[in-house]
Amino acid sequence: MQSGEESRLGIKCASLHEELTQIVIDQDVGPLQRVPASEFLARLVEHMGQTIPREVFGAEAETGTRDLERLGAIVAYIDENFAAQNVLPFTIQRICELCYHPLHYFRVGELRKFVNALEKVCYVRSSWSAGYGAVPSPAEGTPTREASVDVSMSKIPWLPDDGGRDLRQFIEKIESIVSVNFGYEDDEDEGRDAAIQEYYDNEGAGDDEDDDQDYVDEDSATSEDEEEDVEEEEEEEGPEPEVGLEPVHAESAPEECVGTNKRTTAEREDCHMQPCAAAHSTDGAHPCGLKRSKLQEDGATMASPPDIVAEGGSHDPQVVDASKPPQLTTSATNVSCNASIEATVSLDDDSTAGGE
């Protein structure tokens, strides 16, 4: 046969066991309202700080020093903030559940977990008041609501009757407005669907033909653009030269050097155009006397013209007397003029090289 303490789950105080049983098992908060808060908390914290750690969890002073210190701090906090003011913490029901049967939640040797759970529910500031967390009886409270009743249309306990009627009317207005809007949206959807169906039934084929024509127009426009691009490229590159002909490049006009003996192209052409009637004049001067004298004044030297050999009727070479003017043939005249021109050009090149 079990002893009294074992039947009371380790609770030594019989009155505390009855009160905790009524609160935890019967879900009746009557003891919290009848018994002063200071007396109830004094019995509860003694059981919490002394009996539970040593007799329920079997904690020893040497092994569970840290957990016992934390548990003592919890007891001191409850005495100072609630028992001294004769109020209960608003978590008093959860505290009673943990202290009534701690082995229902924790195993033996799990004192640390028990202390952790107490710290979460004891370190609070709000106090418990009458009716807080109480389960009203059907005679005193609102009758049990059926599952089929709409929650949004149920009565709110703290609103007066007039406010409840106004709230019901307001909700009915909202429902009517919402239903009307939904009706308009349905009509718009039906009209849109009908228009789309009619469009595909009547005008679908014509649109396909128009689309095909658009594709053809785009292809033709693309080909014309390509031809224009090719023509522009040909104009930029210019006409191609004919086969077998080399491109002619314009010669840049020679720059006249001031203070030099360089002859210009016009002076050379004048020398070509002068008639060479005789290879030597009567005074022994060069056919191009003016140019020869100009070169002599500038200090340039010129080689004597080549000896002219007169051709007789028998084609025998005869030496021409220097005292008489020689009678030259057409071929001899041409040779003399060409030799003079070559000599003049060589002098011009030498003078240019000396000036540089």
Curated annotation (Swiss-Prot):
Residues 202-240 have a biased composition (Acidic residues). Residues 202-335 are annotated as: Disordered. Residues 326-335 have a biased composition (Polar residues). GO terms for molecular function: protein phosphatase regulator activity. Pfam families: PPP4R2. InterPro entries: PPP4R2. The keyword Nucleus applies. GO terms for cellular component: cytoplasm; nucleus; protein phosphatase 4 complex. Keywords: Nucleus. Belongs to the PPP4R2 family. Regulatory subunit (R2) of the histone H2A phosphatase complex (HTP-C) consisting of PPH3, PSY2 and PSY4. Regulatory subunit of the histone H2A phosphatase complex, which dephosphorylates H2AS128ph (gamma-H2A) that has been displaced from sites of DNA lesions in the double-stranded DNA break repair process. Dephosphorylation is necessary for efficient recovery from the DNA damage checkpoint. This is Serine/threonine-protein phosphatase 4 regulatory subunit 2. It comes from Eremothecium gossypii (strain ATCC 10895 / CBS 109.51 / FGSC 9923 / NRRL Y-1056) (Yeast). The lineage of its organism: Eukaryota, Fungi, Dikarya, Ascomycota, Saccharomycotina.
